[in-house]
């Protein structure tokens, strides 16, 4: 979805050993498809023209947002390898030029209701999992609760954030007001 940048095309390259590729071709071809449609290919070409600009803007915004969140008293932890406090920061800096806009945070929240208030009060973060577009997104772990409990071992206070290409100061202000209402 990063290649296209508008959350309306999924495409990529599959690479692997010859044995793995044979398995994929024999079992997954009908599910994955062999090639994009002409329209999807055109959408990808259009998106590739702005890929570098979008990725850099998202990375710039993510750094500003991560640094703001790391210093906030209502945030337990920010999981973004661009921060020096991240346990794999040194490795990330050796492997990547930039750190992308995807991060997770843990709120210092007493209960699920507080997490839901935070998420519900965000105005600039849609609830979705379609990372790589232009818009900022949130996906709270508490959304993974079914009738018999959580479908994951992750803490209910964790929220996945994708930081898009909007104005970083507006995103920070939105997060700040959401945290204040938690």
Write out the residue ranges for each language-model feature.
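Active-site C-terminal subdomain of aminotransferase-like
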Residues: 2-102, 106-142
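PLP-dependent enzyme catalytic core of the Aspartate aminotransferase-like
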Residues: 54, 109, 136-182
């Amino acid at each position: 979805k990063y290649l296209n940048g508008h959350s309306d095309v999924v495409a990529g390259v599959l690479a692997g050993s010859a044995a793995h590729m044979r398995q994929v071709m024999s079992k997954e071809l009908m599910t994955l498809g062999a090639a994009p449609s002409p329209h999807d290919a055109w959408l990808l070409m259009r998106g590739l023209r702005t890929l570098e600009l979008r990725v850099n803007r998202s990375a710039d915004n993510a750094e500003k947002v991560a640094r703001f969140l790391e210093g906030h008293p209502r945030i337990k932890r920010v999981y973004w390898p661009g921060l020096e406090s991240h346990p794999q920061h040194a490795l990330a800096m050796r492997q990547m030029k930039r750190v992308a806009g995807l991060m997770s945070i843990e709120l210092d929240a007493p209960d699920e209701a507080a997490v839901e208030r935070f998420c519900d009060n965000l105005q600039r973060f849609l609830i979705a999992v379609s990372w790589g577009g232009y818009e900022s997104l949130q996906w709270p772990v508490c959304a993974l609760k079914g009738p018999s409990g959580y479908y994951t071992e992750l803490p209910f206070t964790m929220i996945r954030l994708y930081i898009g290409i909007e104005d970083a100061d507006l995103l920070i202000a939105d997060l700040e007001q959401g945290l204040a209402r938690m």
